[in-house]
Amino acid sequence: MVHFTAEEKSTILSLWGKVNVEEAGGEALGRLLVVYPWTQRFFDSFGNLSSASAIMGNPKVKAHGKKVLTSFGEAVKNMDNLKGAFAKLSELHCDKLHVDPENFKLLGNVMVIILATHFGKEFTPDVQAAWQKLVSGVATALAHKYH
């Protein structure tokens, strides 16, 4: 279980309130698919993923990215119970979708990069440390149902 200090929680909540979920979600998933192309195999139904520009402009990538980041909002609301908050998604990704749990770590790291680019100087090392802790906790929670 991940333990967050009051300061870390405050830092995460403060920044999360400023995140444009639609924009950041689409960008995060798009970058994941570009930087780690083997992750594209889970998105065969998304159409054209042949180039970085095709991926970043793909409406299905943007829509699913928004969905992913919206569900990530559950982590922000449930920092003290990440495993519980992501139990159903963990089961889905393990039993039905067969997603390699390493991909959760990759997406979390891409999310941190997106936040850094969107918030610039506001994304201090302390802010990054809090967010890195959160995305790591989410990745662990999502991998929980894997055998």
Curated annotation (Swiss-Prot):
Listed name of the protein: Hemoglobin subunit epsilon
Pfam families: Globin
Any one of the GO BP annotations: hydrogen peroxide catabolic process
Record organism: Cheirogaleus medius
CDD domains noted in UniProt: Hb-beta-like (cd08925)
Cysteine pairs bridged by disulfides in the record: none
Family, similarity comment: Belongs to the globin family.
GO annotations of cellular component type: blood microparticle; haptoglobin-hemoglobin complex; hemoglobin complex
Protein role: The epsilon chain is a beta-type chain of early mammalian embryonic hemoglobin.
The protein's assembly and partners: Heterotetramer of two alpha chains and two epsilon chains in early embryonic hemoglobin Gower-2; two zeta chains and two epsilon chains in early embryonic hemoglobin Gower-1.
GO molecular function annotations of the record: haptoglobin binding; heme binding; hemoglobin alpha binding; metal ion binding; organic acid binding; oxygen binding; oxygen carrier activity; peroxidase activity
Superkingdom, natural source: Eukaryota
Ranges for domain Globin: 3-147
Keywords assigned: Heme, Iron, Metal-binding, Oxygen transport, Phosphoprotein, Transport
PANTHER family named among the record's database cross-references: HEMOGLOBIN FAMILY MEMBER (PTHR11442), HEMOGLOBIN SUBUNIT EPSILON (PTHR11442:SF7)
Residues annotated for heme b binding in this entry: H64, H93
Annotated positions of the Phosphoserine modification: S14, S51
Cross-referenced InterPro entries: Globin (IPR000971), Globin-like_sf (IPR009050), Globin/Proto (IPR012292), Hemoglobin_b (IPR002337), Hemoglobin_oxygen_transport (IPR050056)
